[in-house]
Amino acid sequence: ITKDALNEYLTIEDKGFYPDYDRFLLYLLLYGCVFRKVYYDSITKKPISRFIIPEDFLVDNNCSSILESNRLTHIRYLSKREILLNMQDGTFRSVALDYLKSTNNIVDTEENDLKEDDVNSGIDISAYSTLSRFKFYETHEYLDLNEFFDSGDTWELDSNSLPSPYVITRCGLSNKIVSIIPNWQEDDPTRTRINCFVHYNLFPGFDI
């Protein structure tokens, strides 16, 4: 029932599904191998199924399928509005990103770009004024978050020390992490990764 309802929504109510599907078929013919992402969009509050350009999807080397890859990275391009909406609804944490400043503030910074903090950071904020979308890396990987905390010299193997699947999103320009989300069912004792990517192969090849 859930699959039928999702299929009906995507093919009837989602106006962007078929234009996106046309691009998907074109890239499949050109590349022979493409990916699609099915997920819940926190901004529209609706399920979304969208094609991913091959250059924007990264997997581990020497894996035969995406299900066997320990790390999957989707390069996303978000507008200023999408970033702020994600921060407002709690999807992203509120972090200081220079390009979220107003255009006037960016111009003022350009005129006074000799400020010590800007020079030391090595970031040219004036370049942001020409960008309409900003790169974010959404990485699906297994992590042991206990490794980020100092537990002393003692270490014992338990269920909490095993790497678990998380979705980590970081800003491509500032390298700041904006989101870390658990990616398994709450009642799943094995903590199996929830996969939202679909791999399509037109021609068999030596690599994924």
What is each of the regions a protein language model found here?
Residues I1-I208:
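Extended alpha-helical, oligomerization-prone segments that build pores/tubes and scaffolds
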